[in-house]
């Protein structure tokens, strides 16, 4: 076989520019800086649009003894009201494990947990109607901190341990032993564009969902699951987001599911734009961590052994906490070398909102 010459081998092949030294703009850069970029709330609203608000738990943990929504249904502008019993499919909207309920049923597990949802002709009237609900609770003991969860062995997932060498021997034989604890607080994502979803019923009985979501495929899957329809009957669209940072990875699906359920029930377009004050209490944040360590060191400051306890405040469900606490454990040695170590990672279950993804897991 004849060998190709250099000219022949390169014929028809375009050279690839490295990009170094070139001005490579974002595909929507001009739209962003001129204000022409359309976010979900900028889309022209259909004339029959309904708006959503939710009625929320006012206690951290308890059983719902009675729920009277008669006044809510009769309130001005209200078109529809739903509870978990109105969900035709599966009300569990968990991203990985189970327990993340679309709406509370017999028990509430954190302050702000949605119990029912209202669709009205304006967001103001929907919010006003929610205040008319009459709810009676039976208070139950609440676990609110990592320390309380550790004491009561309350966990969303089993504890994991990374072990290397004989930690006890290494620490006891060290010249110095250092012990301390550190409480790393959580953090709100505070994206500029809030949580929002627009659901449009389609002519074939399905729904077209436009949402501000980092995971539009999960939105499609969970909306179909909640509605009890085939996945091809749900079109999920995300053009852009005004920030996410992990806060719209698993959290955005709830809004899409509620808006879609109202859209299918009423054959009308529905927008669920969560007020910022609701976002602050209803959606997950960065995990708090309560960390303790005991380390053996030499006179030269060299670490010879470490016992470390990392307790992540996961909230009421697992959500994405498995990987988040794992990541904290993976990074526990930082830039140091531990000849002997035991790292324990606790996924603490508390009666607080279920914490979620945030840039820089763990």
What does each model-identified segment do?
Residues 147-227:
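Helix-loop-helix junctions that connect adjacent transmembrane helices in secondary transporters/permeases
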Residues 87, 213-216, 240-244, 274-284, ...:
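Acidic, glycine-rich active-site loops and adjacent beta-strand->loop/helix elements
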Residues 22, 28-35, 160-197, 288-362:
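Glycine-rich loop/linker segments at domain edges
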Residues 25, 43-48, 101-102, 107-112, ...:
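Solvent-exposed alpha-helices and their adjacent loops that cap or buttress functional pockets
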Residues 54-82, 116-136, 197-266, 323-333, ...:
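Alpha-helical support elements that line or immediately flank enzyme active sites
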Residues 99-126, 246-299, 356-362:
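Glycine-rich and small/hydrophobic secondary-structure elements
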Residues 1-158, 162, 177-180:
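Flexible, low-hydrophobicity surface segments
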Residues 83-84, 233-239, 267-277, 304-309, ...:
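Beta-strand segments within the central parallel beta-sheet cores of soluble alpha/beta enzyme folds
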